[in-house]
Amino acid sequence: MCALAKIVSEQLGGSLSYEEYGNFGFATDVQRAKLERKSNVLYVGDLAKGACRHRALLFKFLADQVGIECRLQRSRHVRGAHIGHAWNFVYTDFDKVFVVDLMHAVGALYPEGSTDANKYARLDAFAFSTLIEGAGPALGL
């Protein structure tokens, strides 16, 4: 699982700190890919930079291909800095569920419901918290 997470992260721009994420600039790369394709429909492989949702989708697809039991989860935020946030749950043979980090500490597995899992999933975040803290909003595809 960790190796797959690292492959996904490297394909879509690498590891970022929480502070760097607001200024990652993936929306510019999405626009570039749309212009090149002359379409709003893109392949994940068109992107050199991907946000959490792009990484979560690619991880889910690849995990399914290699038989890793996985679920893609989308955020409850419908506006604000965390709109479109997504992450993956992975399941072990021992009925344990983990959130896999594809953005920050790439490959880390956080037990479901743990402080780290909730932070990664932004479950306790106010929808506009990134804007309030001064970082740019996470916009894009």
Where are these regions (language model features)?
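Hydrophobic/aromatic-rich core segments of domains that either
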Residues: 50-130
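Secondary-structure boundary elements
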Residues: 1-45
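Long, acidic and serine/threonine-rich low-complexity regions
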Residues: 127-141
